[in-house]
From Swiss-Prot:
Belongs to the alphaherpesvirinae HHV-1 UL43 family. This is Membrane protein UL43 homolog. Keywords: Host membrane, Membrane, Transmembrane, Transmembrane helix. It is a multi-pass membrane protein. InterPro entries: Herpes_UL43. The keyword Transmembrane helix applies. It is found in: Host membrane. GO terms for cellular component: host cell membrane; membrane; viral tegument. The chain crosses the membrane at residues 58-78, 81-101, 114-134, 157-177, 181-201, 203-223, 278-298, 312-332, 343-363, 364-384, 399-419.
Amino acid sequence: MDSVNNSSLPPSYTTTGRTYGHCLQMLTCLEPPCTATNGNGISNNRCLKCIVVTMCSIFSIAAHLAITLSCITLIQFIDQKIIYINCTIYAITGFLIAFIVRLTIKSSEVLTSIGKPAQFIFALISSIADTLITRNMLIDSNPSYVKILRAIEMTSLMCFVMLGAFIASYHYVCLATSGDLTWKAGFLILTAGTIIGISAPYGNISSLFGFLFLYTILAINVVRDASKALMNTCYYRICRATTLRHPSRLGCGRMSSTQDVNATHEEAISSADTIDGQIPMVVMSHATGVLIPVVIALQRYMTKKTVSLTSTDMLQGVCGVLVGASVSIFIPSRRDESLSRPIIILLSIIGAMAITLAGFGLVLGPTLFSACAAALSCYTCINIRNANKGIKQLAAAYVVKSILGFIITSLLVCILVALS
């Protein structure tokens, strides 16, 4: 088989940026030529343009995730009635389902292209309904009108969250099939976006600033496809060519580099086949993720008689995930069996210490435990990615995506803990 240096790059996705306008082209760095490729070959030059596009895409994906999560957190602030708490539970459940369900790449692309403008419309509908209620702009203050507007607002928010969850899920699959450095940077930045999205509604943000930020981010995501921009970079395409040993777009890879119709398609690989030998690590990652709100609830219960737990205390525990993600960046990308047992033992000891501290009512306990859970999840994802190269990379990306989904869902459940 020919070396990757003698093969062409995978075909790029259609660059929709050419239709945006000159200013947006310059802003998204689509015009400068790629310096890492010469024709169909691969040079050893570093491509600054593709580095900038990659980082812009990751930040755009993180901002979109933050907006989606902030809407879930925002539901509880509409009203403290039980129906809104139930809606929060439904939204969290729907978000988790979106990160567990495996859709084909084609279906995800269609859903993303339709869902992004639909999100913008649903956000507009919900904001108009909320403005009419809060600003007393109704001509007739009949309570039935208010109930109808609230129902419209909640329906729009739920649709917004579900569409955003599926879009974010697809974005993370694209990140999980990229190179190690890109994936680690994405894991850290998306974790930061998660924390910002969950904590933003707790801040004293003016409605005008919130609306401007919301619609700016949504407009950017409607106009510019961050996932396609990421997959069009030379780093992503070279990674695909190196991994599969032949040029291929995401979702179109085959076991053989020929056009044999009987060759195994990468979307035909089951995700269950990618966790052989990794099942204990996957179970531990999901278990520690689920235990994050439990540890926070334990710390809340132990301090309830003396000190009331504020939203700030709850967010301090959640922010430990960002600390754990930052530490996990330094974990070696190459799988080393000699490091697995010491890392697992160390994280288990730290987790036990964190639970003990939470039992004594210290805020450091939940913070330390959530950091431990994030580090363990990242380490598990690294092992799964390293154990499944080539044709199995896409199937492994869905497993990695589900681990991230459990972590985010656990942080969202912490909202309900604060309400209890």
